[in-house]
Amino acid sequence: MALKIRLRQHGRTNRSFFRLVVTDARSPRDGKYVEALGWYNPVEAEDDKKLFFKADRIQHWLNLGAELTESAASLIKKTSPEIIRAQTEKKLNSLAKAATKRKKKD
């Protein structure tokens, strides 16, 4: 089961808010999810009430192999840039490791 961390839309017309959830990549946007990780309310005026994410749980799911969608990644970057930084470093390390493996092969 491929997992994604993405936004799930709630609310009413012109008053949408979103929940950050872990879900199967094949499920619909507002379908069943595994775990709720936070919320985002773009209508809220105060910045501290606009975003809330559980950084430790996001990191847990990323370590298990879940992927971030672009919109979720941009919101997480605002509140917890260290999570995005850690994911980027992990990708760069794996790419560097693969490159050295290819060089040794040649």
Curated annotation (Swiss-Prot):
Q: Known Pfam families for this protein?
A: Ribosomal_S16
GO CC, any one term? small ribosomal subunit
List the keywords (alphabetical): Ribonucleoprotein, Ribosomal protein
Please list the GO biological process terms of this entry. translation
SUPFAM superfamilies cross-referenced by the UniProt entry: Ribosomal protein S16
Task: State a single Gene Ontology molecular function.
Answer: structural constituent of ribosome
The answer to whether keyword Ribonucleoprotein applies is yes
The UniProt entry, under InterPro entries, shows: Ribosomal_bS16, Ribosomal_bS16_dom_sf
Query: Per the similarity annotation, which family is this?
Result: Belongs to the bacterial ribosomal protein bS16 family.
What is this protein's record name?
Small ribosomal subunit protein bS16
